[in-house]
Amino acid sequence: GKDNYPWIHIPVGYFKTMHNPKTDWCYKTEPDESMNNISIRYPRGKTLGGSSSINGLLYIRGQHRDYDIWRQLGNTGWGWDDVLPYFIKAENQERGKDEFHGVGGPLSVSDQRIHLPLLDEFQNAAEEFGIPKTKDFNTGDNHGCGYFQVTEKDGFRCSTAVGYLNPVSYTHLRAHETNQ
């Protein structure tokens, strides 16, 4: 469906969009013997913008080495050095442009606005156990503990619908909505 349901655009709204038949396909996994035959909910977006309209807004890229393994397995063009320019081009990073981030792209990426003393203490405790603090999980090395960035701008979600589809108005282009 359309992305005009108000809870889609408010970051805390994912509590109202996940497991909601209006915005989520409400899939479940098959029961698994290793988990006492229970199935797990598997939220998938049922709206323009797909799952980027109902998720927790986390912006975390994969590990450098994982992309390079994909390339080594024969997936030409999928190594870290191949995909990084596209990550940079896609971003509108509030921290500004650097070797890993871009500005001016359709996807708004920002720091979380709320920092909790408990989470700050958790980071300190992790550091005591050898897990480094990090301020950026998108450099290709996700090892560490810290606050992740989110796909949000000015307090509103930046889904693929908001970032890529809504800004474009082509008379010859239509997004087909379906109930399946």
Give short role names for the model-derived ranges.
Residues 162-170:
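N-terminal Rossmann-like dinucleotide/flavin-binding domain of flavoprotein oxidoreductases
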Residues 1-2, 144:
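Glycine-centered small-residue hotspots that permit tight backbone geometry or close packing
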Residues 19, 34, 101, 168-169:
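A generic structural signal for short, solvent-exposed coil/turn residues
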Residues 172-180:
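Single conserved hydrophobic/aromatic residue that forms the stacking wall/gate
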